[in-house]
């Protein structure tokens, strides 16, 4: 992000959203290659809104008249109005309903952001349905499309920390219903890619972060409120949400048949202990650390993606400084903890 002046402190959600949606020069260049419309499926989640606006800003900077269509059930009409204010067309659609899908316009370029995680242990059937039936419906509806599909790093088992994170060739043998449903989602995309020749890129995300949610927010909030920070899951990867969205959009260029998978996260393996101690220093608190680091953790090695599209731009230190200030100033949080401490796959 060296071409942008980053603020020392982010005071408001408007300032945060402006930073989150700044496109990289690489995205501005790439966006010119996308044929209209760019179809964004499942924009109602934590990442979708800023991804949509980032795509719009990239097209505007490129001087390129790209039509962007954001698709969601849109139970939140405020979100719908916000996207439309950025000249993003919105369509209400339930991707579990084939008839609703048939009403969507044709598109060659598709970003797939649909998923269901939390509450899996209470309602596993819903998780399996959303994570398998929806991608099957989309692949049947757009057999000639080019799809960048958001997946999850949780499809890997815990791996030895000393190895530096799972590579994309690691066997997919995770624990828990949610993680296995994510494996099934990838297999559905692979199956239809083989059946129809649909080019697909599978983006395995490890912990997107901004100031209102994310693994760094979870740790910082625990430190600030003197809650214990469990060190058992002692190491993690993370990535600034803006960088993740930038790479997801650009990953359309990596779509192939059969699909190729890419770990989507920052380059570092970070110690939870060191993160907690740094937040304690930044916020004038004492970190209440409990437990001891296990030899394994949920980690991914992003070298394959970085070699093709470059490393994420946002430094860890900048994210931590912003988050510490945000929490001290009582900035709004989404109240959606990542549960990064979970080691048995039960979300």
State what each model feature region is.
Residues 227, 231-234, 239-347:
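C-terminal substrate-binding subdomain of Rossmann-fold SDR/epimerase-dehydratase oxidoreductases
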Residues 49, 74-78, 82-130:
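NAD(P)H-binding glycine-rich loop region in Rossmannoid oxidoreductase-like domains
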Residues 39-57:
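N-terminal Rossmann NAD(P)H-binding glycine-rich loop of SDR-like oxidoreductase domains
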Residues 123, 128-135, 148, 181-182:
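Short alpha-helix in the Rossmann-fold core of NAD(P)-dependent oxidoreductases
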Residues 60-78:
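Conserved glycine-rich Rossmann-like NAD(P)H-binding loop of the short-chain dehydrogenase/reductase
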Residues 1-39, 61, 335-347:
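Non-catalytic terminal and boundary segments that flank Rossmann-like NAD(P)-dependent oxidoreductase
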Residues 37, 109-112, 117, 133-177:
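Conserved Rossmann-fold NAD(P)-dependent oxidoreductase catalytic core, especially the SDR/UDP-sugar
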Residues 175, 183-237, 241-243, 279:
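NAD(P)-dependent short-chain dehydrogenase/reductase
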């Amino acid at each position: 992000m060296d071409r942008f002046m980053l603020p020392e402190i982010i005071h408001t959600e408007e300032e945060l959203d402006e930073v989150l949606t700044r496109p990289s020069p690489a995205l501005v260049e790439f966006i010119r290659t996308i044929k209209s419309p760019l179809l964004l499926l499942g924009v109602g989640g934590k990442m979708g809104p800023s991804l949509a606006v980032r795509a719009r800003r990239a097209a505007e900077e490129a001087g390129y008249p790209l039509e962007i269509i954001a698709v969601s059930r849109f139970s939140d009409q405020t979100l719908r109005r916000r996207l439309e204010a950025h000249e993003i067309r919105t369509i209400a659609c339930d991707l579990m309903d084939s008839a609703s899908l048939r009403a969507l316009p044709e598109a060659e370029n598709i970003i797939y952001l649909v998923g269901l995680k939390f509450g899996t242990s209470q309602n596993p059937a819903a998780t399996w349905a959303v994570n398998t039936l929806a991608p099957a419906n989309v692949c049947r509806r757009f057999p000639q499309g080019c799809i960048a599909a958001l997946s999850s790093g949780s499809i890997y088992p815990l791996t030895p920390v000393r190895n530096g994170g799972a590579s994309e060739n690691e066997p997919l043998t995770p624990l828990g219903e949610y993680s296995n449903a994510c494996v099934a989602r990838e297999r559905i995309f692979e199956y239809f890619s083989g059946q129809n020749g649909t080019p697909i890129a599978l983006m395995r995300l490890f912990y997107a972060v901004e100031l209102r949610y994310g693994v760094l927010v979870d740790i910082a909030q625990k430190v600030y409120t003197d809650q214990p920070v469990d060190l058992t899951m002692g190491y993690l990867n993370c990535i600034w949400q803006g960088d993740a969205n930038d790479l997801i959009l650009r990953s359309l260029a990596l779509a192939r048949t059969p699909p190729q998978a890419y770990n989507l996260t920052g380059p570092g393996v970070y110690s939870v202990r060191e993160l907690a101690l740094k937040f304690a220093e930044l916020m004038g608190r004492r970190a209440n650390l409990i437990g001891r680091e296990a030899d394994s953790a949920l980690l991914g090695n992003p070298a394959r993606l970085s070699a093709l599209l470059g490393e994420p731009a946002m430094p860890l230190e900048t994210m931590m400084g912003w988050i510490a200030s945000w929490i001290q100033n009582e900035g709004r949080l989404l109240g959606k903890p990542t549960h990064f401490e979970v080691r048995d796959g039960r979300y």
